[in-house]
Amino acid sequence: MSEHKNGHTRRDFLLRTITLAPAMAVGSTAMGALVAPMAAGAAEQSSGSQTARDYQPTWFTAEEFAFITAAVARLIPNDERGPGALEAGVPEFIDRQMNTPYALGSNWYMQGPFNPDLPKELGYQLPLVPQQIYRLGLADADSWSKHQHGKVFAELSGDQQDALLSDFESGKAEFTQLPAKTFFSFLLQNTREGYFTRSDPRWQSGHGGLEADWLPRRTR
């Protein structure tokens, strides 16, 4: 991913909006709600003083968490104006998300048929909930990284990581278990949610943060 987009840094581009990534194409019934039980659940379990270094994941494997940690650091990097996703504790936030009803798709309509070719306005069209998307997507992402560079994503240089993230975003990367775009869209959206939630003073006092259960909404 290039460091600048239309005259703005990557950080500016990612932080100036919290709209959904286009590839997700989900319903907007909850877009106006900024305080949500799911985010509160992930936040209240976390310790505001715990750093990314000493946090031990409870759902992701060590290898998966290394990918998440490296990726969010590239998606929202720190700069002279403030901390990035890593410093804000986004990896911990995403890991804790995986232990909430959101990650199991508890509030989603997940009955078939699923048709990925339908217009995006009709909502998410894969039979996969977030836990599955991350587990399969992380495996495919590291497999693609090894195919391209001989190393897993977390071991690559920053420039190499940026290039691979761009490939995931565009769909150029060839995943075998789900579309690369779908994996990237979830990762990007959850990174944004985690960053804004963890940066919100309400998170520190356990009063919740940003909505994260907006993602897939399918019409029946």
Curated annotation (Swiss-Prot):
Q: Which Pfam families match?
A: Gluconate_2-dh3
Q: How is it modified after translation?
A: Predicted to be exported by the Tat system. The position of the signal peptide cleavage has been experimentally proven.
Enzyme nomenclature, EC number? 1.1.99.3
Q: How does activity depend on temperature?
A: Optimum temperature is 30 degrees Celsius.
Q: How does activity depend on pH?
A: Optimum pH is 5.0.
Catalytic activity annotation: D-gluconate + A = 2-dehydro-D-gluconate + AH2
The UniProt entry lists membrane topology as:
Peripheral membrane protein
Which InterPro entries does this chain map to? Gluconate_2DH_su3 (IPR027056), TAT_signal (IPR006311)
Q: Which domain of life is it from?
A: Bacteria
Keyword Plastid applies: no
| Keyword Cell membrane among record annotations | yes
**Signal peptide range:** 1-42
GO CC annotation: plasma membrane
Where is this protein chiefly located? membrane
Q: Which GO terms describe its molecular function?
A: gluconate 2-dehydrogenase (acceptor) activity
**Keyword annotations:** Cell membrane, Membrane, Oxidoreductase, Signal
Give the UniProt subcellular location, in the record's own words.
Answer: Cell membrane
Q: What does this protein do?
A: Part of the heterotrimer that catalyzes the conversion of D-gluconate to 2-dehydro-D-gluconate. The role of this subunit in the heterotrimer is not known.
Cite the record's note on assembly.
Heterotrimer.
This chain's protein is named Gluconate 2-dehydrogenase subunit 3
| Organism encoding this protein | Pantoea cypripedii
UniProt lineage: Bacteria, Pseudomonadati, Pseudomonadota, Gammaproteobacteria, Enterobacterales
